[in-house]
Amino acid sequence: MDRAKQQQALLLLPVCLALTFSLTAVVSSHWCEGTRRVVKPLCQDQPGGQHCIHFKRDNSSNGRMDNNSQAVLYIWELGDDKFIQRGFHVGLWQSCEESLNGEDEKCRSFRSVVPAEEQGVLWLSIGGEVLDIVLILTSAILLGSRVSCRSPGFHWLRVDALVAIFMVLAGLLGMVAHMMYTTIFQITVNLGPEDWKPQTWDYGWSYCLAWGSFALCLAVSVSAMSRFTAARLEFTEKQQAQNGSRHSQHSFLEPEASESIWKTGAAPCPAEQAFRNVSGHLPPGAPGKVSIC
């Protein structure tokens, strides 16, 4: 593989990496992660459980509770140890939350918790992410054909130009979609249902992958455009050099042709033969000498 093919293959690598990052971010549900403050359930159905409030009632005839039960009620009324922290993570499609035992997760659609007036913006964000993936995939296909095909020509330079345009569009669309999703999530945190609102949250690894894909898109776009510009200038210089060589060859042939014409033309007459006495062949009264060559 020559140097040009190696450079094209190296340019294809970050495109595939950006495509992988975008696909992983879209299908995953770790854009935002955090904890929710959830009220502990009573231990009536879970005797001996660790994540519930323990109490027992006195079965005496007067119906009053013993000292242990009163202590438990005192803790319940003050709110100490009343809540438990549950981890959750949210993506474009669903929101998942840990169960009480911490072994499995309970998921629901993220669209179901977004306020109704903001769901259109959520769909715009999802559409931007999908279009971002389509543009990156198109760029990967174009670069793959650029690497696999060996036919030279200026038309292949247009592939680099298209890749640069598609990748910068993908990066800009991805940036807008990421910012729209961030806005939607923050609005949902403030205006969403009470049984979903997180206490603490931060951005997850899916969000980092999405922005990593954005950075790769811009880097590939700049690299492809610089390659196109350099190749275009080189192609133009070669054309100018070829036109200059043809012009110099044409200018070199013109003096040779003129010289050959002079060599094959009539030789000048000697000075002593320039004038001849033709008086015998002229009518009376005409001059006696004429100049001929």
UniProtKB/Swiss-Prot annotation:
Localization (cell): Membrane
A single cellular component GO annotation: plasma membrane
Regions of this protein lying in the Cytoplasmic compartment: 1-8, 142-160, 226-293
Transmembrane segments: 9-29, 121-141, 161-181, 205-225
Keyword Cell cycle appears in the UniProt entry: no
Protein's membrane topology: Multi-pass membrane protein
A Pfam match: GSG-1
Keywords assigned by UniProt, alphabetized: Glycoprotein, Membrane, Transmembrane, Transmembrane helix
Highest taxon of the lineage: Eukaryota
Spans within the Extracellular topological domain: 30-120, 182-204
Glycosylated residues, chain numbering: 59, 67
Family of the protein in this entry: Belongs to the GSG1 family.
Record-given protein name: Germ cell-specific gene 1-like protein 2
Lineage summary: Eukaryota, Metazoa, Chordata, Craniata, Vertebrata
